[in-house]
Amino acid sequence: MQLNSTEISELIKQRIVEFDLTSIIYNEGIILSVIDGIIRIHGLSEVMQGEMIALPGNSFAIALNLERDEVGAVVMGPYSHLTEGMKVKCTGRILEVPVGHSLLGRIVNTLGIPIDGKGKLENKLFSPIETNAPNVIERQSISEPIQTGYKSIDAMIPIGRGQRELIIGDRQTGKSTLAIDTIINQRNSDIKCIYVAIGQKASTINNVVQKLEEHNALINTIIVTATASDSVALQYLAPYAGCVMGEYFRNIGENALVIYDDLSKQAIAYRQISLLLRRPPGREAYPGDIFYLHSRLLERAARVSANYVETYTKGKIKGKTGSLTALPIIETQAGDVSSFIPTNVISITDGQIFLESSLFNAGIRPAVNPGISVSRVGSAAQTKIIKTVSSGIRTTLAQYRELEAFSQFASDLDEVTRKQINYGKKVTELLKQKQHMPMSVSQQALVLFAAEQGYLEDINLKKINDFETQLLLYVKHQYHDFMKIIDQEGNYNDDIEKTLTEIISKFKTNASF
């Protein structure tokens, strides 16, 4: 069969019409160098700041330096397989991590990938790690407390839902323990917890997981880890990943608590990245935007209004406010709170809890220095009963410290001064608390009421701890319903004061101290 020229022409036209070529446009570049996890790329003319760059071997980098002729990017993970001349391409996406209730009880890395051996996440929700903080109109004033379970903190340095309270101190002063105990104390509350471990040993993180499991608190907690063996990029990004996981709960009208342990290591990781990218170093060799590194993270902690929640959920949730509370941890060197990173974070947060080595070594745990520890907004959220019964504790301790310093130089003290010093010692002893043993509101109220009303005056200093232990056992059996009401309502009135007085009077009559 022979085809004439007309038929051939028609056949070619038909094939041209039917031909379908899907063209995909890539913005490609070529790796110029790979040094210490930093890659320099020629090309990528359309890349965005913070965009993910697809690398060979199913790995990714994040673009941080956008220069005239090349792009500086940091590799997320191992980079030994990367060599000069390899092709890379833009993805058009910012880094996203999984969010939602399915993460509760799981241990994930910075990218939200589970590392606890419990299988894949059943999750369909993702969110970019960099989001804008709620503006002033979208926020609501802080009016509800977060109970840490520590008498000294809940009484003198109260923390509210939506607050940012810095925990600062030298190494081995109990900073992480305080944070972990705060998580343990939320096990029966509606607060979801996120613990972000930055630059820590894997064995340390394993101990934290075991403690949370022992106290049945892991079920309500997400642990985000970037260990010391992980790349600096993952250590730098870990707090933002943890923050966005907490923001999800805030935005749907729930309450979340995020702990960054610790931001000093994140700052060091970011300094390392910046120096490798050849950015100009500033004070202590940190880059010029180190303040912005922490401010854009901590400003995302807030209590948001019901309108904000309603808008975010597209009308599905109405009349509920949400909150994200942040407890960043900063490690100081030899108690120097005036160095660069500590002063930056102090100026960003709503207060700080300062833990002192000298107090810790003297056996005062938690080693809180009430003189320079402060909560700027938490008092508005403090439970009424705790606020009332602890009103004089800070003053008592301040007078005690002043008189104790004075007594070291004075040979003879009058009776009033001696009494004040002795009572200050007893209050200090009463505020001591063992780790992983948080106290309920009612227990704190009872013990602080005893201190405030002078019931410790006739008790020997060495018997203070026994007095507290036996008093709490006594009320647990004799006044269980009364204590439950205080835990639920937190109110304080004449009837409650009368009952508290009756409890302690009866206890002291029956017990001998």
Swiss-Prot record:
CDD domains: ATP-synt_F1_alpha_C (cd18113), ATP-synt_F1_alpha_N (cd18116), F1-ATPase_alpha_CD (cd01132). It catalyses: ATP + H2O + 4 H(+)(in) = ADP + phosphate + 5 H(+)(out). The keyword Nucleus does not apply. ATP binds at G169, D170, R171, Q172, T173, G174, K175, S176. Keywords: ATP synthesis, ATP-binding, Cell membrane, CF(1), Hydrogen ion transport, Ion transport, Membrane, Nucleotide-binding, Translocase, Transport. F-type ATPases have 2 components, CF(1) - the catalytic core - and CF(0) - the membrane proton channel. CF(1) has five subunits: alpha(3), beta(3), gamma(1), delta(1), epsilon(1). CF(0) has three main subunits: a(1), b(2) and c(9-12). The alpha and beta chains form an alternating ring which encloses part of the gamma chain. CF(1) is attached to CF(0) by a central stalk formed by the gamma and epsilon chains, while a peripheral stalk is formed by the delta and b chains. This is ATP synthase subunit alpha. It comes from Baumannia cicadellinicola subsp. Homalodisca coagulata. The gene is atpA.
